[in-house]
């Protein structure tokens, strides 16, 4: 019996470990793993199916094929356990050890490990300081390498060809040794003195001045340091013993018909063994050198193929010409070990089926088909049957269940009660894609799903399937109930808004209920309470939409939950439908909140208010009741669509006719040469775009109102003046769109307006629009034109899904180890939040931006000076309301960017957990949530890049800014301007802004003012809404004179640098600067047309404070508007640059833009930022580039070489600020980090990403983007190593530097200084400290090669590593589990040390 118990014990042993280390295996290590040498290539005997002795499946080496039975059958059964059979040499034990025991092959000649040879950069090359090409020549027997030069003039590591070698042998005899093949490389490696090499390299780095040498030396130094530190020997990169994988992991399976299916590894091993044995035989026979060489090369190639097939040369193929799957292929890629078996496992106790709607369910329930439940809950039923005594054994219980006897169904009901199950819909894009429900048994075979959770699952009922999973253990059930139950997931973790919002018919029903109809039956009746209204409605005395007056009893509640709700009775003018809804309103919500037409947005606000005021439980019940009402009244309303609902506007024909006239006119202008082809096309597209909008507007105007008809007479009602009385329309289509249930104005426009302009396959717009709509029907040409767009939509969707999924995967990978690990890191850092104002519109108010954040400094009331909220307070709805009423316009809040927690984040810097509505808990995996929140809406973004000239160019170019509110004008400190002769203020700064403050001094709007604009208001002037603040010429950019004087041209030569153009219409001649490339005279290529100013004595005017003359360069395409020798005043225009000449850039939009930002790619045609604050001057041009010099305040010059076709926004003598744009173009985020710091970078990425999502109407909290930026900035570059062990220029984790610096400061040594490095998400994922996580992401081979040389230790900090090694993840409940485990380990080790000490004392 004891033996039996021992047997069970064997299975359940569990190893406790805290980290995993990877390294190179020494030959001794490999032999110690092995249970014997594999000498023969045979696998199994094809007659007896028994493994051959000493072969690849040998039972003597790897263990018995059957449990407790040796191969020859002499020993069977448990009693012989552990005996080794003397006849066949097999140990009698479990056959399971054939999965664990390894063998080995003694190689007759050393072989290089291909990973360390070919995985770039080649590690062997770095260690030996040889090129990969040279090492390969030695390894593959094309050259000799000198291993010991002796007294000869040869160098160690020098390569000799065959002829060289023979000559040198004649010359020096055997004073030197040179070898071919891996032996030579191995000798070189084993003779290396690593500490000595490290010394000389460090010396070289300090003494040499060459950049490339330093870089190269640093790379070598890193590898050698790693070998030195890890205690591994470089010669282990050359294999002398090859380990053999346990046979069960490369199985050979007999198929029917006498054939065998085998793993490719067996083939690869067989080749290695065959070649190895042949080589041994040849060596014994003393075969000629050339034959042996060939055999050694073949051995090297076969080992290469086994380790990584296809890495070098042609891949080895099997019988069917397909490349064999090597060891490296087994672990990498989507089908490899990491992603297929470790990160994505299939689970037991699960099922899947089609979903159907279950409108009668409560929010926390789902319908589970009986058959499915029976199968899923089998073990529970067996157990119950046994305890009840219905079945004596499991077998009997099984029989009962299979016969489906009545008692089984009763037991199933009992087992299922209060046992939640998890439902999952693929693709699971965010955490709400798996939720727990209580199952209700249903007939049929489909799972029933509650309609309100569809939004979270993104499910519909057109044939979607869902999977069911059963949590087995009590802990799992508990977590399901407390964390995953659908009623606990009311808010979306992406933005904190409710995600359980009614949609479609529910919205339509509620909208219809709350609409008011003039002249409905029972209008104007007065009721004493709701129940009276219900009676009247049910007896058909009043209609649902009639306006009535009713007394309503309310229980009002304030947000601070201390006080009891107060009862009050108020009279309301309302409608019957709204009165009916007030019955289901939870106590504490005022009636006024539903006394309006309920559209989708209003319903969302309603549920949000309910959650904040009445708590979770009430809200869930309320949402359910809303749903039942919505369905019920949508049915009673009987809203449907018929053709007459599609009202085509009467003005349509006139509008189209007018547009056709305009187009005709422009065509005539084009023929007579007044407009260019491009202008004509743009204008035509503009005209039709406008016409389409006009038709749509006319249609909506007609659709949205209807005349009121009298119920009795059926006549249209008129007022005193004989005007027709109108009301909001009850047109079905209008109601659907207006309520937000389905459809939009754009779709209705196509149904009953005109379809409008269509795009060609290349994205350009076809200038003849479709004037018909779907109601009228399309003709053949119109139909053909529209097919392209429709198909492109489908193709786009498929691409989008894949791209979006890949983006999510990269985001998850970079943030997966970010968990809230402590309560407060006590930092005083944070970011200052203001309202986001663009133009005159507040895009995001201050309240939205700071809601759910923690204040970083005390928030003070500006009027009283009293502290309203202390630092460290979580700002909830009440707080942000008060901050807004106090007129505070900026607040410093904590942010994940400045959090000082080493591994992880602190709760205070993160703020509110958006999915739960309170301060985030320790253990929350905020990284993954951030990644999901950004990745999940990815499928809604567009895929394409817009070309200007497509739909984008329809927006009219702005030529002025006007205020939208009353207030006081304030100039920003960047703005610089001059006064011209007419006393107008002309702006001469590039990044100037004006903003408007209201009477409380709060910023209301902010406008960018371009260079050359005329300011029409003064700083501090009081203005009215609608006043024009500044105006400018939209299509031309001026160059403004900042000095007065006489103009002198230089290098302005007609026919050389400029040409005279006659304007066709006006007949005036102007000078236009031509492109240097088009100049015909060779020596004139370098000439730059410029202008200087002379004072009255004809001396050149200098830049104030310097001896440099003012010179202003005219750029290519400039139209010069002054004459040589003309007297000009300050603020006058010297030249104009037509805007059309600036190249139209493609605007990257949608998903590619988001990916580009997070990958931190340098955009093409990148703009330049000023490296320092200083004065601009132009230097000498080079070929094709112009040289721009900024001299800073200390007189240090910073040079730029800028391509000639780029537009430099700065000009000679202009003062620019550090980080200001000096060359137009998209900005490189790395520049922003370098010149403006972390905060500016985060702001830039945040705003840019948000712009993309905002365009699609997706709300994501800034917090999530900040979390990802934090991960992109987690590595730093060492600038000065101080007394640390870092190498200058090395990139390391920030946490590592901080820890090291703390130690150094404690010892009074020099800490290392560093700069932040911005890494793209892919790069950041690969450069993480955890090699397991990086290897499972991408580039598995490279990651593992590097890690093994470094002897890296993975501390299993992140989630991914722990999933891979099969432990609980260190997040949520797992975090506390790991912490408790660590504490226990510490106390155990402490106790262990104590006992040691006492024993020692005793012995003393």
Curated annotation (Swiss-Prot):
Record GO biological process: DNA-templated transcription
Lineage, broadest ranks: Bacteria, Pseudomonadati, Pseudomonadota, Betaproteobacteria, Nitrosomonadales
Alphabetical keyword list: DNA-directed RNA polymerase, Magnesium, Metal-binding, Nucleotidyltransferase, Transcription, Transferase, Zinc
Function: DNA-dependent RNA polymerase catalyzes the transcription of DNA into RNA using the four ribonucleoside triphosphates as substrates.
Note accompanying the cofactor annotation: Binds 1 Mg(2+) ion per subunit. Binds 2 Zn(2+) ions per subunit.
Gene Ontology CC: DNA-directed RNA polymerase complex
Known partners and oligomeric status: The RNAP catalytic core consists of 2 alpha, 1 beta, 1 beta' and 1 omega subunit. When a sigma factor is associated with the core the holoenzyme is formed, which can initiate transcription.
Keyword Cell division: no
Gene assigned in the entry: rpoC
Cofactor(s) listed in the protein's UniProt record: Mg(2+); Zn(2+)
A matching Pfam family: RNA_pol_Rpb1_4
Keyword Transferase: yes
Disulfide bonds: none
Stored NCBIfam families: rpoC_TIGR
Protein name: DNA-directed RNA polymerase subunit beta'
Amino acids binding Mg(2+): 460, 462, 464
Family per record: Belongs to the RNA polymerase beta' chain family.
């Amino acid at each position: 019996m004891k033996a039996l118990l021992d047997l069970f014990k064997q299975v359940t042993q569990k190893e406790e470990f805290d980290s995993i280390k990877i390294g190179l295996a020494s030959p001794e290590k490999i032999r110690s793993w092995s249970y014997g040498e594999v000498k023969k290539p045979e696998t199994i005997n094809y007659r007896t199916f028994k493994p051959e002795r000493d072969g690849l499946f040998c039972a003597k080496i790897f263990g018995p094929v059957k449990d407790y039975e040796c191969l020859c059958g002499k020993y069977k059964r448990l009693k012989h356990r552990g005996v080794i059979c003397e006849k066949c040499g097999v140990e009698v034990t479990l056959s399971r050890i054939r999965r664990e025991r390894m063998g080995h092959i003694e190689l007759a000649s050393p072989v290089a490990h291909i990973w360390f040879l070919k995985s770039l950069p080649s590690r062997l090359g770095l260690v030996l300081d040889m090129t990969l090409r040279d090492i390969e020549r030695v390894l593959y027997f094309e050259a000799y390498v000198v291993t010991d030069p002796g007294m000869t003039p040869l160098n160690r590591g020098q390569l000799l060809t065959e002829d060289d070698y023979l000559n040198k042998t004649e010359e020096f005899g055997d004073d030197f040794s040179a070898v071919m093949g891996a032996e030579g490389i191995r000798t070189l490696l084993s003779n290396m003195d690593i500490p000595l090499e490290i010394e000389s390299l460090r010396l070289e780095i300090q003494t040499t001045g060459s950049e490339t040498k330093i870089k190269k030396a640093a790379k070598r130094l890193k590898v050698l340091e790693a070998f030195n530190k890890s205690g591994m020997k470089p010669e282990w990169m050359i294999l002398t013993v090859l380990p053999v994988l346990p046979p069960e992991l490369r199985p050979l399976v007999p198929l029917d018909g006498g054939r065998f299916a085998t793993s490719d590894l067996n083939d690869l091993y067989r080749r290695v063994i065959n070649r190895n044995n042949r080589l041994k035989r040849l060596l014994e026979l003393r075969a000629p050198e050339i034959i042996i060489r060939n055999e050694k090369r073949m051995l090297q190639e076969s080992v290469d193929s086994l380790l990584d097939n296809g890495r070098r040369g042609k891949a080895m193929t099997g019988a069917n010409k397909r490349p064999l799957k090597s060891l490296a292929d087994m672990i990498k890629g989507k089908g490899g070990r990491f992603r297929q078996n470790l990160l994505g496992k299939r689970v037991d106790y699960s099922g899947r089926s089609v979903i159907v709607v279950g409108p009668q369910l409560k929010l926390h329930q789902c319908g589970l088909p009986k058959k499915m439940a029976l199968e899923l809950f089998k073990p529970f039923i067996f157990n119950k049957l046994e305890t009840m005594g219905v079945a004596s054994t499991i077998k009997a219980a099984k029989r009962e269940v299979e016969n489906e006897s009545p008692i089984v169904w009763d037991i199933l009901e009992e087992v299922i009660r209060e046992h939640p199950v998890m439902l999952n819909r693929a693709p699971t894009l965010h955490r709400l894609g798996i939720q727990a429900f209580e199952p209700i048994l249903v007939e049929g075979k489909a799972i029933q799903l509650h309609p309100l959770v569809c939004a979270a699952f993104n499910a519909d009922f057109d044939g979607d399937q869902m999977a069911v999973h059963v949590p087995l253990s009590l802990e799992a059930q508990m977590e399901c109930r407390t964390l995953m139950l659908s009623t606990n997931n009311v808010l979306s973790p992406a933005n904190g808004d409710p995600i359980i919002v009614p949609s479609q018919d529910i919205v339509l029903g509620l909208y219809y209920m709350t609409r008011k109809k003039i002249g409905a039956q029972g209008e104007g009746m007065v009721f004493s309470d709701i129940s009276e209204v219900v009676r009247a409605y049910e007896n058909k005395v009043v209609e649902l939409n009639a306006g009535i007056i009713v007394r309503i009893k309310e229980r009002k509640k304030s947000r601070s939950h201390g006080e009891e709700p107060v009862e009050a009775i108020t009279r309301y003018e309302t409608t019957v439908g709204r009165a009916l809804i007030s019955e289901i309103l939870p106590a504490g919500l005022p009636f006024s909140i539903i006394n309006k037409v309920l559209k989708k947005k209003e319903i969302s606000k309603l549920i949000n208010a309910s959650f904040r005021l009445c708590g979770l439980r009430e809200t869930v019940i309320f949402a359910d009741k809303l749903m039942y009402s919505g369905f019920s009244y949508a049915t009673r309303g009987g809203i449907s669509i018929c053709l007459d609902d599609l009202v085509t506007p009467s003005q349509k024909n006139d509008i189209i006719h007018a547009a056709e006239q305009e187009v005709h006119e422009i065509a005539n202008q084009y023929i007579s040469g007044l407009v260019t082809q491009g202008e004509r096309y743009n204008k035509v597209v503009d005209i039709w775009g406008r016409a389409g909008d006009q038709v749509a507007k006319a249609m909506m105007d007609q659709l949205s109102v209807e005349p009121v008809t009298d119920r009795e007479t059926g006549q249209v009602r008129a007022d005193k003046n004989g005007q027709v009385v109108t009301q909001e329309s009850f047109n079905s289509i209008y109601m659907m769109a207006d309520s937000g249930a389905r459809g939009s104005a754009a779709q209705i426009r196509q149904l009953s307006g005109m379809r409008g302009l269509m795009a060609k396959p290349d994205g350009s717009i076809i200038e003849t629009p479709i004037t018909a709509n779907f109601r009228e029907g399309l003709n053949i040409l119109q139909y053909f034109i529209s097919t392209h767009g429709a198909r492109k939509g489908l193709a786009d969707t498929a691409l989008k899904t894949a791209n979006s999924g890949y983006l999510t995967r990269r985001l998850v990978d970079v943030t997966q180890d970010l968990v809230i690990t402590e309560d407060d890191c006590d930092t005083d850092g944070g970011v200052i939040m203001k309202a986001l104002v663009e133009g005159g519109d507040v895009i995001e108010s201050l309240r939205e931006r700071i809601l759910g954040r923690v204040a970083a400094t005390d928030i003070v009331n500006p009027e009283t000076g009293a502290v309203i909220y202390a630092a460290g307070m979580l700002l909830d709805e009440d707080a942000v309301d008060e901050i807004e009423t106090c007129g505070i316009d900026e607040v410093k809040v904590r942010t994940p960017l400045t959090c000082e927690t080493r591994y992880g984040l602190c709760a205070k810097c993160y703020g509110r957990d958006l999915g739960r509505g309170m301060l985030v808990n320790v253990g929350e995996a905020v990284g993954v949530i951030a990644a999901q929140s950004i990745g999940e809406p990815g499928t809604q973004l567009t895929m394409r890049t817009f070309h200007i000239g497509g739909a984008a160019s329809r927006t009219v170019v702005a030529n002025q800014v006007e205020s939208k509110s009353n207030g006081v004008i304030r100039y920003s400190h960047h703005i610089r301007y001059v006064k011209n002769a007419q006393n107008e203020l002309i702006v001469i700064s590039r990044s100037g802004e004006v903003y408007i403050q209201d009477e409380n001094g709060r910023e209301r709007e902010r406008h960018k003012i371009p260079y050359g604009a005329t300011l029409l208001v003064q700083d501090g002037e009081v203005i009215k809404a609608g006043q024009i603040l500044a105006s400018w010429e939209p299509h031309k950019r001026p160059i403004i004179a900042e000095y007065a004087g006489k103009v002198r041209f230089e290098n302005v030569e007609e026919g050389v640098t400029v040409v005279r153009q006659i304007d066709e219409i006006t007949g005036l001649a102007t000078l236009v600067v031509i492109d240097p490339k088009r100049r015909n005279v060779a020596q004139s290529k370098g000439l730059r047309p410029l202008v200087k100013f002379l004072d009255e004595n004809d001396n050149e005017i200098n830049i104030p404070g310097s001896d440099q003359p003012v010179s202003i360069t005219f750029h290519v395409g400039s139209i010069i508007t002054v004459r040589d020798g003309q007297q000009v005043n300050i603020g006058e225009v010297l030249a104009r640059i037509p805007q059309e000449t600036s190249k139209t850039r493609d605007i990257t939009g949608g998903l590619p833009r988001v990916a580009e930002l997070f990958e931190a790619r340098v955009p093409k045609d990148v703009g330049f930022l000023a490296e320092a604050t200083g004065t601009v001057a132009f230097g000498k041009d080079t070929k094709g580039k112009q040289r721009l010099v900024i001299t800073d305040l200390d007189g240090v010059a910073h040079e730029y070489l800028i391509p000639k076709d780029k537009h430099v926004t700065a000009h000679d003598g202009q003062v620019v600020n550090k980080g200001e744009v000096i060359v137009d173009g998209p900005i490189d985020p790395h520049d922003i980090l370098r010149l403006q710091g972390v905060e500016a970078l985060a702001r830039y990425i945040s705003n840019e990403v948000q712009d993309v999502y905002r365009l699609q109407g997706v709300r994501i909290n800034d917090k999530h983007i900040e979390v990802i930026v934090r991960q992109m900035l987690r590595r730093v570059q060492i600038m000065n190593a101080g007394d640390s062990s870092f190498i200058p220029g090395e990139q390391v984790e920030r946490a590592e530097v901080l820890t090291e610096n703390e130690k150094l400061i404690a010892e009074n040594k020099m800490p290392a200084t560093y700069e932040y490095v911005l890494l793209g998400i892919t790069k950041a994922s690969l450069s993480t400290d955890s090699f397991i996580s990086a290897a499972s992401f991408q580039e598995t081979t490279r990651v593992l090669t590097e890690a093994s040389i470094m002897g890296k230790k993975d501390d299993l900090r992140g989630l991914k590593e722990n999933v891979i090694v099969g432990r609980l993840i260190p997040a949520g409940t797992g975090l506390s589990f790991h912490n408790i485990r660590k504490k226990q380990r510490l106390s155990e080790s402490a106790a262990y040390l104590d006992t040691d000490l006492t024993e020692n004392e005793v012995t003393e």
